From Swiss-Prot:
A zinc finger (C2H2-type) spans 18-42, 48-70. Pfam families: zf-C2H2. GO terms for biological process: positive regulation of transcription by RNA polymerase II. This is pH-response transcription factor pacC/RIM101. The lineage of its organism: Eukaryota, Fungi, Dikarya, Ascomycota, Pezizomycotina.
Length: 70
């Protein structure tokens, strides 16, 4: 068997199947970084703060999108 056939990725049949275990959420993803990012939805922390207006966000990509509006 070729290594690429066992590779865990978008085209593999052996993908990870990660499901959020928070309450009854059940969001599923195949990438660890996606589930890690998703878990921030359930936590009240907002560590990413806008330097222009002070608005805070849970995820860096949300702050980045917000800053484009300034």
């Amino acid at each position: 068997e070729h290594v690429c056939e066992r590779h865990v990725g978008r085209k593999s049949t052996h993908n990870l199947n990660l499901t959020c275990q928070w309450g009854s959420c059940n969001t599923t993803t195949v990438k660890r970084d996606h589930i890690t990012s998703h878990l921030r939805v359930h936590v009240p922390l907002k560590p990413h703060k806008c330097d222009f207006c002070g608005k805070a966000f849970k995820r860096p990509q949300d702050l980045k999108k917000h800053v484009k509006n300034h």
